[in-house]
């Protein structure tokens, strides 16, 4: 008797062969037909610089571009898309990502459905390189989803109608620019995310509050150093409509963060303090929840496991992103119906997106009914 995986594989390939795999979306019906090849997985990749629509400033740096590497995995005529985005604090670059990808031999695999074997092999090649591993993970998930003819949110048993509103990020800037950015976002988003962590925090919030009273999330990016002052600021923030705080203090000050979380009237989420699933036990009790970013945790496979582990431990879950194209953002959005908060606006911050994918409609994430991660190259 076939096991479940073999059944799904056979059913998916049978549907493909019959030309029945089709999901409608912005690109219309899609059909994937198996083209006889050598039976091996093939990967190609190329650098792609993301150009930001505005200068992006957080507590520790500013930038106008983000380095990125686009990845494609092909099997028997069907292609899955992935990407690696490398903001400065990840400590990765186009050179390190392409260097890692050049070491990966996917040609040894002839069955894309053996995802655990493939991704475990990729992960074993180095202790780091999270973004590079993520690019392969996303592309493989996209490929397998296409072969099965289903988006991953359906394969995970999630209801797309439960996808949350996404935050839209307002970076640190002058009051004039902050006001301009906020005016652009009003009416399009139900919650905004504000970068804080400098002496201008109060001015930032007060400027935004002259424009809108929508709920706000704040991200200090480790910018606060004194726990008592941080707590005073959090109480002030709560009075001004803030609903959550992300990474208030440096990750090295875990005891101070735990104290802050214990006394805070708002939930405190870990970002820089966590990368992978193995990190969750070490921050238990210090944070109310975790922010899962695919570029840090090596992709969808581990991100989904982290979300379930955090839930089982009674923690809140947030899914976030880097500055990315709609490829990686749509991948992260596949488990957004499972989370408490979503910060999936990275594709909206760039001027040269390569894909059509997840949309924001009336402030809410809208997942395309297309197989895999749901993206179409532009």
Q: Which sequence ranges carry the predicted segments?
A:
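Flexible C-terminal active-site loop/helix
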Residues: 12-14, 35-50, 68, 76, ...
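N-terminal export signals
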Residues: 6-26
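Metal- or metallocofactor-binding catalytic centers and their adjacent structured scaffolds
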Residues: 32-45, 61, 74, 79-147
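Short Pro/Gly-enriched beta-strand edge/turn motifs at strand-loop
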Residues: 49-57
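Catalytic alpha/beta core domains of metabolic enzymes, predominantly
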Residues: 255-257, 263, 269, 273-344
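N-terminal secretory signal peptides
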Residues: 1-3
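Conserved, mostly hydrophobic/aromatic
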Residues: 71, 77, 136, 149, ...
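Metal-dependent enolase-superfamily TIM-barrel catalytic cores that perform enediolate-based chemistry
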Residues: 152-264
């Amino acid at each position: 008797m076939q096991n479940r995986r073999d059944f799904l594989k056979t059913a998916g390939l049978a549907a493909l062969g019959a030309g029945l795999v089709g999901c409608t979306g912005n690109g219309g019906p899609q059909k994937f037909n198996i083209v006889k090849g050598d039976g091996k997985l093939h990967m190609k990749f190329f650098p792609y610089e993301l150009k930001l629509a505005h200068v992006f400033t957080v507590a520790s740096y500013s930038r106008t571009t983000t380095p990125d590497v686009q990845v494609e995995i092909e099997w028997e005529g069907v292609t899955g898309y992935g990407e690696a985005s490398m903001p400065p604090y990840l400590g990765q670059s186009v050179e390190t990502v392409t260097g890692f990808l050049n070491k990966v031999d996917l040609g040894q695999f002839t069955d894309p459905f053996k995802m655990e074997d493939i991704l475990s092999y990729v992960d074993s090649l180095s202790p780091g390189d999270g973004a590079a591993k993520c690019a392969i993970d996303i592309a493989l998930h996209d490929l397998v989803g296409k072969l099965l003819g289903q988006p991953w949110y359906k394969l995970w048993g999630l209801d797309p109608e439960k996808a949350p509103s996404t935050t839209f990020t307002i970076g640190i800037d002058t009051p004039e620019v902050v006001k301009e950015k906020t005016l652009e976002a009003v009416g399009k988003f139900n919650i905004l995310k504000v970068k804080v962590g400098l002496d201008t925090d109060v001015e930032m919030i007060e400027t935004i509050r002259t424009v809108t009273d929508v709920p706000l999330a704040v991200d200090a990016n480790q910018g606060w150093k004194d726990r008592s002052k941080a707590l005073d600021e959090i109480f002030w923030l709560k009075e001004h409509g803030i609903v959550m705080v992300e990474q208030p203090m440096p990750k090295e000050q875990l005891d101070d963060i735990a104290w802050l979380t214990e006394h805070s009237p708002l939930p405190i989420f870990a970002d820089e303090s966590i990368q992978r699933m193995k990190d969750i036990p070490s921050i238990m009790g210090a944070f109310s929840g975790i922010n899962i970013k695919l570029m840090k945790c090596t992709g969808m496979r581990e991100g989904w496991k982290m979300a379930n582990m955090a839930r089982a431990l009674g923690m809140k879950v947030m899914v976030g992103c880097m500055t990315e194209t709609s490829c990686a953002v749509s991948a992260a959005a596949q488990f957004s119906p499972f989370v408490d908060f979503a910060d999936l606006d990275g594709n909206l911050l760039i001027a040269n997106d390569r894909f059509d994918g997840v949309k924001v409609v009336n402030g809410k994430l809208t997942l395309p009914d297309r197989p895999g991660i749901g993206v179409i190259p532009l």
